[in-house]
Each structure stands twice: as C-alpha cells, then as structure tokens.
Amino acid sequence: MKRPDYRTLQALDAVIRERGFERAAQKLCITQSAVSQRIKQLENLFGQPLLVRTVPPRPTEQGQKLLALLHQVELLEEQWLGNEQGTDTPLLLSLAVNADSLATWLLPALHPVLADLPIRLNIQVEDETRTQEQLRRGEVVGAVSIQPQPLPSCLIDKLGALDYLFVASPEFATRHFPNGVTRSALLKAPAVAFDHLDDMHQAFLQQNFELSPGSVPCHIVNSSEAFVQLAKQGSTCCMIPHLQIDQELKNGELIDLTPGLCQRRMLYWHRFAPESRTMKKVTDALLKLGRQMLRQDDIN
C-alpha cells in the first residue's frame, strides 16, 4: 500500500489553496524549490501527475482524492488528539457555499460555533449548482449544494429551500412594465446575473414566459447584496431570495412582479464521513438555524 508523507500532501494542498508555488512556499516557510521537490516526491510515489500546472494550478483526479484524504485526516486528528500537540493554531475549515446563503442565514448559523471553537473558516463562494464539485475535488470539507445525492464516503442532510422572487422597485415596474409583466416587456427590461453560468433568471423566464435562454439582457455582478441595491435603486429587475428582502417587500421599496410565482432552490449540506466532533458541531448549527430560516414545506 502506498503511504504518502503528509508533508508532501500539505505541500500539494498549499499550492492549490494559495494558487501557486511561490505563495505556497511562503505559507509553509520553505523555499519554492522545496515545495516542488515535495510534490515531485508525491507524484513519483503514485506514478502519475497530481497537479495540472496551469495558472492557477489545479489537482488531477488522483490529486483530488489525496487532498480529500488529507482534509479528513486533519479533522480526525483534531478529534482524537485535540490540542495535545501544543499548537495554538486554529483548525482550518474550508466550506463551499452559495452567495445567497452567505448573505442570509449561514453566518448567523455559524456564530455559536465560531464563539465556542478555535477554528478558522475559509469560505469559498460558488454557485449552489457547483459547490459539490469543490467537495469532490477535495478543496473543501463541507458544501451547501442543491445536489440531492451524496458523493461516495460523504454525508448529506436536507437544510430547506430558498424561494426566489422576481422583484423590482415600483419606479422600475412603472417604467418597464406599464401594462404588466409581458414577454415583450421582459425582452427589454435590464436584468442581472451573478456570473455567466448563473441561469436562474433565464430559467424563471423560460418556465413562466417561454422566453429562450439568452434573450434577456443581463448585467453580471458577483455580489448577492448588490442585487438588492440594484433592484432598490431601479436599475434592474432580478431574482432575489424572499428571505433576503422581506423588509423591503413590507415597506414597499421592492415589489413582487409575479405574485404567486417563485423559483425554489432546495439546499443540502454535504460533508465528508466520518464526521469529526468539530464538523458535527458545524453540522448541528447549520441544520438548527437553516431549518428555522429556510422553507420547510418539502422537508420529509
């Protein structure tokens, strides 16, 4: 059985996390040449490349498996050894979450964990359709995802749903939809997407108004909070979680353009198994507040 030296795995992990050899060397307090040597040693052990040397570097499939192994071992070491090794370094937890969860319920959910445990979060923001891939690649130890099936050797729990409403300011609605929300008006109304892969707005219009994907002009803005600001100032119409704009809907700053219609995204919490004590506390905190704040109609 091939047993890697964990110093070599930590070098591989550092190159991925720091997005390059130079910063990885600084992080590990060794030379860049030493980082390269450790990774080469690991690649020689397994007889195959473990890094795709692009900018930034990314792990191969075998590299992903080794990173996942490293992260699981680190969590289990924390569980069984605790701080017996005399280090005051907080445990690093890398989590992949969608921007809308981060802007609404996730940080309040993690508050008691951060207050109680010596951990350091590395939150990586990604669309909920793609966060599970980061877990698969070993880049994170937990992910909020819409995928209902767990990866091999992973655990999953249903959190609840975010309901997205199609909203705009009253002034925007008067200007762009004087005769109501129609197909012809939608083709001219400015909208916004999180990135070029964000298809929620287009999917909603296709499902409810039979508009083909790509037919509506969209700004690209990588910020959940900016969606709210753009809508409130009358610049765009957009899909925003009801949870995020409850107050704006109540005070009239925003209006629901299509009452009775919404785009629902059921969210799941994925993480590696077995679960360490620290990850169990993270899981319990996310499930507790997530199930209080997210829609639960479809929870079995």
Curated annotation (Swiss-Prot):
It comes from the Bacteria. PROSITE patterns: HTH_LYSR. Residues 21-40 bind DNA. Residues 4-60 form the HTH lysR-type domain. GO terms for molecular function: DNA binding; DNA-binding transcription factor activity. InterPro entries: ArgP, ArgP_gammaproteobact, LTTR, LysR_subst-bd, Tscrpt_reg_HTH_LysR, WH-like_DNA-bd_sf, WH_DNA-bd_sf. Keywords: DNA-binding, Transcription, Transcription regulation. The keyword Membrane does not apply. The keyword Repeat does not apply. Homodimer. Belongs to the LysR transcriptional regulatory family. Controls the transcription of genes involved in arginine and lysine metabolism. This is HTH-type transcriptional regulator ArgP. It comes from Photorhabdus laumondii subsp. laumondii (strain DSM 15139 / CIP 105565 / TT01) (Photorhabdus luminescens subsp. laumondii). The lineage of its organism: Bacteria, Pseudomonadati, Pseudomonadota, Gammaproteobacteria, Enterobacterales.
